[in-house]
UniProtKB/Swiss-Prot annotation:
Keyword annotations: Host G2/M cell cycle arrest by virus, Host-virus interaction, Modulation of host cell cycle by virus
GO BP annotations listed: symbiont-mediated arrest of host cell cycle during G2/M transition
Superkingdom, taxonomy of origin: Viruses
Family: Belongs to the orthoreovirus sigma-1s protein family.
Record-given protein name: Protein sigma-1-small
Organism: Reovirus type 2 (strain D5/Jones)
InterPro entries: Capsid_sigma_1s
Lineage: Viruses, Riboviria, Orthornavirae, Duplornaviricota, Resentoviricetes
A Pfam cross-reference name: Sigma_1s
Length: 125
């Protein structure tokens, strides 16, 4: 039992492995897209998502063959930093602590709303 990796260790290993493959090339992104479980796991492991990963998440979700309802459910379950948060803000420990209390879901993010506002309106009715 002592040698079993903790949940955080497994999550960190998965995040590092997938992040490396994501950053290597566009071909890696394509292979992630082809395996929904890989990129969904990657997004969950990287939470909260920064600006760059929000854009990547939206592209991956947009290019997938998910139903509109599943896309929305997925977006509601992924935690992200608000659109006004920058990397330099996260480097300041006091500010980063305050920002942690303002984390939102992907479905609340400005970029998601711009892309999927028509989808949200059809699902509400």
């Amino acid at each position: 039992m002592e040698n079993q990796p903790t949940r955080n260790t497994r999550s960190r290993k998965l995040r590092n492995k997938l992040k490396t493959s994501l950053l290597m090339s566009t071909g890696s992104v394509t292979s992630l897209i082809q395996s929904k479980d890989n990129w969904v796991d990657y997004l969950y492991a990287c939470q909260p998502l920064n600006r760059e990963l929000v854009r990547t998440a939206i592209e991956l979700i947009d290019s997938s063959e998910m139903s509109p309802a599943y896309r929305l459910a997925l977006a509601e379950s992924i935690r992200v930093y608000p659109s006004w948060v920058t990397e330099s803000m996260l480097q300041n420990s006091e500010l980063a602590s305050w920002i942690q209390s303002r984390i939102i879901s992907l479905s609340e993010h400005q970029d998601w709303k711009l892309k999927y506002q028509p989808l949200l309106m059809t699902l509400d009715h």
